[in-house]
């Protein structure tokens, strides 16, 4: 269960609606504190029609979003975050024409640094085709940032 379910859902919705994620048509399941971020296979996401491989940037985006959402599940209040480091190891090629999913897990948190593992899979979560490792920094908002955020959220809710 996320530390703050309302905050988590707000951040989850924000992340999957970033313009780049909308273009990729990323979607997700936020029913747990380790959400699954997904994208359906599309030919336009291939690095090359000759290889048939999904572009590495698509996988990188999925890993980054899944990791950020998993970190957001730990927050009691809004915090600023940034990806400091990310590594993806490919174990095999994903199967064409099947959705790609990523789930992440925060395995260690030291002060403002969080270490997150993720796995990329298709039909069977126990058979990942790639593994990710991410390091994030996070910090509480200043009072001015909190006030600006509250004003923004009120505007968004009024729409």
Kindly label every feature range from the protein language model:
Residues 68-101, 133:
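Hydrophobic beta-strand-centered segment that forms part of the acyl-chain substrate-binding groove
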Residues 36-38, 101, 115:
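General beta-strand recognition
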Residues 57, 65, 86-92, 118-121, ...:
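Hydrophobic alpha-helical segments of small multi-pass membrane proteins
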Residues 23, 83-85, 113-115:
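Short coil/loop residues immediately preceding or within conserved phosphate-binding loops
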Residues 23-54:
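Catalytic strand-loop segment that frames the active site of acyl-thioester-processing enzymes
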Residues 1-29:
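N-terminal leader/capping segments at the start of a protein or of a new domain
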Residues 50-64, 68, 83:
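Compact, glycine-rich, soluble single-domain proteins
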Residues 1-6, 95-96, 105-159:
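HotDog/MaoC-like acyl-thioester-processing domains
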């Amino acid at each position: 269960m996320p530390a703050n379910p309302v905050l988590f859902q707000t951040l989850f919705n924000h992340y999957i609606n970033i313009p780049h994620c909308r273009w990729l048509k990323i979607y997700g399941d936020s029913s747990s504190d380790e959400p699954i971020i997904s994208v359906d296979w599309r030919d336009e996401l291939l690095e090359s029609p000759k290889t048939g491989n999904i572009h590495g940037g698509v996988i990188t985006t999925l890993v980054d979003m899944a990791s950020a959402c998993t970190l957001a599940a730990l927050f009691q209040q809004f915090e600023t975050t940034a990806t400091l480091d990310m590594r993806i190891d490919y174990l095999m090629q994903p199967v064409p024409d099947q959705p790609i999913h990523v789930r992440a897990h925060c395995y260690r948190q030291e002060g403002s640094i969080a270490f997150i593992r993720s796995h990329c899979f298709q039909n069977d979560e126990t058979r990942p085709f790639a593994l990710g490792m991410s390091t994030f920094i996070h910090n509480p908002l200043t009072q001015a940032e909190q006030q600006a955020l509250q004003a923004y959220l009120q505007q968004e809710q009024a729409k």
